[in-house]
Amino acid sequence: ETYNIGGGAELPNMTVIDTICAEVDRAFAEVDGLAARYPDAPAAKGEPTISLKTFVTDRAGHDRRYAIDETKARAELGYAPQRGFEEGLRHTLRWYLDHESWWRPLV
């Protein structure tokens, strides 16, 4: 069987980007040493991360959002997300910040 696992949060792509930027800024304000680890980041210089966002011409067939239908997983497995979108994003971002040795060799 195949199941889609989603968070029940259907958001426009731009909202996702804005939320990521806000969470990065929040992390820089709350986590000691981030500015030293990432000195080129806008937040390390006191600038908002959203300043990195630029607008480009949409490609043909551009998706304004991506939605996952987890209805089958809910019905057959009793699945339900444990976190809302913003909390889950914050948790994911903090995991990556805490596990740089895992992802750094991949970039």
Regions picked out by a protein language model, each given a short descriptive name:
Residues E1-V107:
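C-terminal substrate-binding subdomain of Rossmann-fold SDR/epimerase-dehydratase oxidoreductases
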